[in-house]
Curated annotation (Swiss-Prot):
It catalyses: NAD(+) + (deoxyribonucleotide)n-3'-hydroxyl + 5'-phospho-(deoxyribonucleotide)m = (deoxyribonucleotide)n+m + AMP + beta-nicotinamide D-nucleotide. One of its GO terms (biological process) is DNA replication. This is DNA ligase. The keyword Transferase does not apply. It comes from Photorhabdus laumondii subsp. laumondii (strain DSM 15139 / CIP 105565 / TT01). The lineage of its organism: Bacteria, Pseudomonadati, Pseudomonadota, Gammaproteobacteria, Enterobacterales. GO terms for molecular function: DNA binding; DNA ligase (NAD+) activity; metal ion binding. Keywords: DNA damage, DNA repair, DNA replication, Ligase, Magnesium, Manganese, Metal-binding, NAD, Zinc. InterPro entries: BRCT_dom, BRCT_dom_sf, DisA/LigA_HHH, DNA_ligase, DNA_ligase_AS, DNA_ligase_CS, DNAligase_adenylation, DNAligase_N. Zn(2+) binds at residues 408, 411, 426, 432. The active site is at 115 (n6-amp-lysine intermediate). NAD(+) binds at residues 32-36, 81-82, 113, 136, 173, 290, 314. Disulfide bonds: none annotated. Residues 594-672 form the BRCT domain.
């Protein structure tokens, strides 16, 4: 048995080596037939000795049973998108913004890569073995596609080499090469199956197959470009060196990567890739530019849902002329009011375009656009059509000025536009039909009202069936009504009803956060709760009173005032408090700037399990004593409070030499 086990392991090592040469190095040493012979030999031995089969064996890429549905995966570190630039002037502006923020007068060292047109995925390796794969999803929550990812030959089931971290999350793009895409569509036409519009759709559809045997037949490829979770190990201090390290571990990395030391080199690389684009063999839609130094990346940080240290330098899109027949106003899921031009249909980049975004009122004014104008349409990033110019010399005499509405076209609430902000927004967040699903998802989320079992698909059904229109309606649901939803039995329905009842007892800070007031995150909600103590006092506060609160500036103050003066929102809040009975323990009113405590002015991170206080209670007490409680450890963190089973945050704190105390010490300091 020992010699058989050794023979099996030798075959696995040999096969992994040849997979690496084929997929990563693009330099196979043996014919496909010899690889197939070795694989068959391993399969035969594993059939004889099934007790010797391991999950990372090359034979185990396929074999999982079809799924009923994909389970949700919450990304421990969000998978953010990138901001875009579309021309040299915009890129130089990005370069200047970065240098200004870093107070650098010289050009920065950056790493340029291809922007692949595929599907972003997360690969989690533990002790070198692939244990989970997930889609990007909305950046916070994706889908578990482990069984499908295992079928892609380019993705190693086990990393090899030296210095592999105990836990590392590799991020990259799954895509379908053009030859494989064409062959797939040829076969689809022959059999009468669905024909895919483009390689990206084909890749996405292939990864979302419930049966991994179907995915295994699709010609998918993969390149990695970054890392998320990193525990129990170290990586090089530059992005480029990290890519080299990934390749050493057996992960495929594009060979179209260049380190540039000035902005002109970046622009030259961009034009080189534009010229090579058609010969690459797979779709790309631009070049990604990243600050090479990880230290500088950390200093630059993030804005909204994108890093400040990277941008996507997109390719120019094809343009066409057409006529604007009308302008309508759409309401997005976050309340953004977007003007949309209704166009005389025209073909752009092979697609018939009849609508185009106008972004906002400023853009309409900048363009000088009127209804009836002849305009130039571009498919920005090859995806979203937009108006980029107006041919005023073709303007008809009966053209009409575009009038921006004062009230939401969906719910009738006031439209808010803060000075200095381009986007106008509906203020009826708690009642607006266009925002309903997003508002309800946020309201029941773990960090808000924390309604266990109330997932995204349940919210979708409740809204689609018109069972729920406002957050208060959730608490009026019965087990009988919930049982009528898909995949909701009597026991599950009762559990949701019980969870809703439990959620009525909350904290002032959680309730404020759950309302979804623009720019009011967890920390700001906690500061508002600690400062005002009572909901009525907060509702009646003016901008000047709000600006006295820690971390509340003019913009946030305006959002809060506008939210609470909107009559529709007032009705829903009164309903939640007076009729539903949402309640919380009285809050001790504090003024953080006047407090003399060990935590005053400190940025604090909580990690691990606490036993004497709940996490909410600990946060509230810390905020009340002037602390700013955040969710991640960085160089700006002043103190980490580590409970039981603290993990990566504690490790990072130790790495950065940030002071760490335990729960007992926190309790002692809270009493001072």
């Amino acid at each position: 048995m020992k010699s058989t086990a050794q023979q099996i392991e030798k075959l696995r090592t040999t096969l992994r080596h040849h997979e690496y040469l084929y997929h990563v190095m693009d330099a196979p040493e043996i014919p496909d037939a010899e690889y197939d012979r070795l694989m068959q030999e391993l399969q035969d031995l594993e059939e004889q000795y099934p007790e010797l089969i391991t999950s990372d064996s090359p034979t185990q890429r396929i074999g999982a049973a079809p799924l009923a549905a994909f389970e949700q995966v919450r990304h421990e570190i969000p998978m953010l998108s990138l901001d875009n630039v579309f021309d040299e002037e915009s890129y130089l502006a990005f370069d200047k913004r970065v240098r200004d923020r870093l107070k650098e007068t010289q050009d920065l060292v950056v790493c340029c890569e291809l922007k692949l047109d595929g599907l972003a995925v997360s690969l989690l390796y533990e002790n070198g073995e692939l244990v989970r794969a997930a889609t990007r999803g909305d950046g916070t929550t994706g889908e578990n596609i482990t069984s499908n990812i295992r079928t892609i030959g380019a993705i190693p089931l086990r990393l090899f080499g030296e210095n592999i971290p105990a836990r590392i999350e590799i991020r990259g793009e799954v895509f379908m090469p053009q030859k494989g895409f064409e062959k797939l569509n040829e076969e689809a036409r022959r059999t009468g199956a669905k024909v895919f519009a483009n390689p990206r759709n084909a890749a996405a559809g292939s990864l979302r197959q419930l049966d991994p045997r179907i995915t295994a037949k699709r010609p998918l490829a993969f390149f990695c470009y970054g890392v998320g979770i990193l525990e129990g190990g170290e990586l090089p201090a530059s992005h480029y060196e990290r890519l080299i390290q990934f390749k050493k571990w057996g992960l495929p990395v594009s060979d179209k990567v260049k380190v540039c030391t000035d902005s002109q080199q970046v622009i030259d690389f961009y034009h080189d890739i534009v010229n090579q684009r058609s010969a690459l063999g797979f779709d790309i839609d631009g070049v990604v530019v990243k600050i090479n130094s990880l230290e500088l990346q950390e200093i630059l940080g993030f804005v909204a849902r994108a890093p400040r240290w990277a941008t996507a330098f997109k390719f120019p899109a094809q343009e066409q002329m057409t006529i604007v027949r009308d302008v309508e106003f759409q309401v997005g899921r976050t309340g953004a009011i977007t003007p949309v031009a209704r166009l005389e249909p025209v073909q752009v980049s092979g697609v018939i375009v009849s609508n185009a975004t106008l972004h906002n009122a400023d853009e309409i004014e900048r363009l000088g656009l009127r209804i009836g104008d002849t305009v130039i349409i571009r498919r920005a990033g090859d995806v979203i059509p937009q108006v980029v110019g107006v041919l005023e010399e073709r303007r008809p005499q009966d053209s009409n000025v575009v009038v921006f509405p004062e009230h939401c076209p969906v719910c009738g609430a006031d439209i808010e536009r803060i000075e200095g902000e381009a986007v106008a927004r509906c203020t009826g967040g708690l009642v607006c039909g266009a925002q309903r699903k997003e508002a309800l998802r946020h309201f029941v989320s773990r960090r808000a009202m924390d309604v266990d079992g109330m997932g995204e698909k349940i919210i979708d059904q409740l809204v689609d069936k018109e069972y729920v229109k406002t957050p208060a309606d959730l608490f009026r649901l019965t087990a009988g009504k919930l049982t009528g939803l898909d995949r909701m039995g009597p026991k599950s329905a009762q559990n949701v009803v019980d969870a809703l009842e439990k959620a009525k007892k909350t904290t002032f800070a959680r309730f404020l956060y759950a309302l979804g007031i623009r720019e009011v995150g967890e920390a700001t909600a906690a500061n508002l709760a600690a400062h005002f103590g009572e909901l009525d006092k907060l509702r009646s506060a003016d901008e000047e009173a709000l600006k006295e609160v820690q971390d509340v500036g003019e913009v946030v103050a305006k959002h809060v005032v506008n939210f609470f003066i909107e009559p529709h929102n007032q009705t829903v809040i009164d309903d939640l408090i007076d009729d539903i009975g949402i309640n919380w323990e009285p809050v001790v009113v504090t003024r953080a700037e006047k407090i003399d405590s060990p935590f005053s002015g400190k940025t604090v991170v909580l990690t691990g399990s606490l036993h004497q206080l709940s996490r909410d209670e600990a946060k509230a007490k810390l905020v009340a004593l002037g602390a700013k409680v955040t969710g991640s450890v960085s160089k700006k963190t002043d103190l980490v409070i580590a409970g039981e089973a603290a993990g990566s945050k504690l490790a990072k704190a130790n790495e950065l030499n940030i002071p760490v105390i335990d729960e007992e010490e926190m309790i002692r300091l809270l009493g001072e």
